[in-house]
Amino acid sequence: MAIINLPVPTNSSSEVNKHNHLRSCLPSGRATFTTLSAAAMRSATMAAANVREQSGQKQQLINRRSGNYEAPLWEFDYIQSLKNEYAGDIYVSRANELKEQVKMMLDEEDMKLLDCMELVDGLERLGLAYHFEGRINRLLSSDYKAIHEGNHQRNKEDLYAAALEFRIFRQNGFNVPQDIFNDFITEDGEFDESLSEDTMGLLSLYEASFLSLEGEATLDLAREFTTKHLNNYLGKENTDQNLRILVYHALELPLRWRAPRIEARWYIDAYERSPNVNPTLLELAKIDFNIVQAIHQQDLKHVSWWWKNIRIAEKLTFIRDRIVENFFWAIGAVFEPQYGSCRRMLTKVFALITMIDDIYDVYGTLEELELFTDAVDRWDVKAIDQLPDYMRVGYLGFFNSINEMAYDALKEQGVHIVEYLRKVWADLCKAYLQEAKWYYAGYTPTVEEYLENAWVSMSVPVMLMHAYAGVTNPMNKEAMDVLDTHDIVRCSSYLLRFADDLGTSPGEMKRGDVPKLVQCYMKEAGCSEEESREHVWFLLRETWKKMNKDSEWAESPFSKTFVTAAKNFGRVALVMYQYGDGHGLHSNPEAKDRILASLFSPVPPA
């Protein structure tokens, strides 16, 4: 049965024209918080007045909403009981031996171009490239130079090789034009139909097409052409089973959109089934994955202790108690062993975001939310006195945790970041408050209003300000001054927003949440839900084209590690929301299985 979760149009130019007005709604510039229309504001004000009147009557109970969230799947005692033999020296020693063998492969002289591309591709997909970044860059630089000097000849008849070369170079920051695919296009401007029998070539071109930039029509055409024929391949009988699995996986989500750590676990199994498996790479991939998993488990134990001791979930029983899922976001963003302190900090940040989100979305009255927003904006512990009792535990736990993170940065780098953190957290709460006002007013925002607020309410500026502090040494004022409104942050926010809205919108609307982008566009365009979802997928693809501008990000004040983390947040969002809400609900078995494989289940030895 063919699978295609990503709606693909039949005509690239007509698609762009059809969606142009929606794409123009993607705002740019500093965050602003839109005001309601006069009528909507009057309605919201009346709603707030009603709440205030009710709160003044001590005997009157407030009718609060409920998210009906289940208890956590992984309890504190289970997490603390985790033991992992791969933390021992014997496995680290064996991994070091294997890494030396891989270095010899990378240093081999006169390696054929295709062999080089396949080796680098294997290392990247198996999650091993971080060990060999310097060697990989030198190897690709040498090959790139040789191509331009005419010492490497491209095979103009091998679609698989051409597309693999294009993808590996582009995803490593080298400028390769889409024109290299002109040799596979007929005089009428279409890809040669004879290529439809070359399934490996189609798969390679399909993956390459998702590294497209804005305006690259050839790659848009390649995506449509390959998607059509790969789906046809799945509809055939008696096909190669291993290739069939690879095609199915790619059509489910392209490699460019997959979180590297989660993809590595899947690809280890796929690679083991390959007839061209390299035993050294396979053994190293298995051992390294398990060693890193052992490190991640220690990080998880640490944040689990913090979450239990802060007692927020115990006191605020209406929130999502999801410390493992929060940690999964962190390893999806930065999995490398050396970033343990960043993962721990990000997990705490995600847990606090989840708490605050549930206060605004589910439990708080409009008056209470205005008080909480003011307290965060003032960043004053004395503001706790104005809050209702249930908010005080959450506010103080939040306030102390963020100040402690700022203190760590001051202690370790001598950089005072509390004002930067205060601003992004205050902006987040203001965006949440805007959504609450829309809800109480019964107001459906325009697409432009929604997106201008939603890229902030998705909390990515908060995540990435903390991530910057976690992966950058030394931090610099230039980067922090522009971070919360930089294009890389806005694009990352949109990727999360689109994935979140596509995955959780039905459940949240049932609960009584503010309309999401799908509903906003349905109302504005007068279209069906299916058509609206297709629009959102289009926006997601267009945003990835902006994210693919690696040469531009290289000129930014941010490190490659930070830019990768920004992309990875968008990738993890697709993992978490691909089959529904994998963060808040337990009804998404695929997300649960991915968490189990990444965090709790070692890869079986060869």
Swiss-Prot record:
Alphabetically ordered keywords of this record: Chloroplast, Lyase, Magnesium, Metal-binding, Plastid, Transit peptide
Pathway given in the UniProt record: Secondary metabolite biosynthesis; terpenoid biosynthesis
UniProt cross-references to Pfam families, sorted A to Z: Terpene_synth, Terpene_synth_C
Binding-site residues, (2E)-geranyl diphosphate: R320, D357, D361, R497, D500
The keyword Magnesium is annotated on this UniProt entry: yes
Positions contributing to Mg(2+) 1 binding: D357, D361
Main localization of the protein described in the UniProt heading: plastid
Residue range of the transit peptide in the UniProt record, numbered on this chain: 1-38
Reactions catalysed, as given in the entry: (2E,6E)-farnesyl diphosphate = (E)-beta-farnesene + diphosphate; (2E)-geranyl diphosphate = limonene + diphosphate; (2E)-geranyl diphosphate = beta-pinene + diphosphate; (2E)-geranyl diphosphate = sabinene + diphosphate
GO cellular component term of the entry, any: chloroplast
CDD domains assigned to the protein according to its UniProt record, in alphabetical order: Terpene_cyclase_plant_C1
SUPFAM superfamilies, A to Z: Terpenoid cyclases/Protein prenyltransferases, Terpenoid synthases
Residues engaged in binding Mg(2+) 3: D500, T504, E508
Note describing how the cofactor binds: Binds 3 Mg(2+) or Mn(2+) ions per subunit.
GO terms of molecular function: magnesium ion binding; myrcene synthase activity; pinene synthase activity; sabinene synthase activity
UniProt similarity note: Belongs to the terpene synthase family. Tpsb subfamily.
Function recorded in the entry: Monoterpene synthase (mono-TPS) involved in the biosynthesis of monoterpenes natural products, constituent of coffee beverage aroma. Catalyzes the conversion of (2E)-geranyl diphosphate (GPP) into limonene, beta-pinene, sabinene and beta-myrcene, and, as minor products, alpha-pinene and alpha-terpinolene. Can also, with a low efficiency, use farnesyl pyrophosphate (FPP) as substrate to produce beta-farnesene. Not able to use geranylgeranyl pyrophosphate (GGPP) as substrate.
Protein name: Limonene synthase, chloroplastic
